[in-house]
């Protein structure tokens, strides 16, 4: 089945300054893979049978990487809403925990929350069997981490898999520094859709992905995550 994801601005490879951007663009997905990227009008005319998901004034980019996976999933406890203790992560809530089922359930809730921020890749290492299973079933790409005791991530960006960090990478990284991979023809269809920030996405000169913005802003034009797609599946959609 073909699905056409339309957005006001599609940035398939923001890390490459020579890569094209597509105002009123679209990504055509067949199964798990990207079949085409380009102008919406042309793709819609060429594939009238495709199902259209129109994300309106949004920005479509590759998904985000979360470099804090080890700490967030192996040490942090993500409460069950039925526990009545709120939904905020509990730092070191799993330290010394021996109940694998509890660890696995916490990891599943944490992963679901990551998807809500546009995360499509997460850094390990994951030492608990229950956590490894949860991550594998989530569909997120697993990245090598810096280790449980390290303080600098594999990307050399000053953050590491073994240190504390947020579920939302954009809380500490600009969008350009948080993106993982690119949206490329023949590649796995992993991407995220973001609402525009205060400046919108029209007239997209300057710095639409935050390469010149301050850490923690996520870039001047980026709002919250509207949707996350993993291997062609819509795994999160903000209501």
Place the predicted regions along the sequence by residue.
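Short, well-ordered secondary-structure micro-motifs within conserved domains or adaptor modules
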Residues: 2, 51-54, 154-171
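N-terminal metal-binding scaffold of metallo-dependent hydrolase/deaminase domains
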Residues: 1-46, 169-220, 229-239
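Short, charged, surface-exposed secondary-structure boundary motifs
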Residues: 63, 151-158, 216, 238
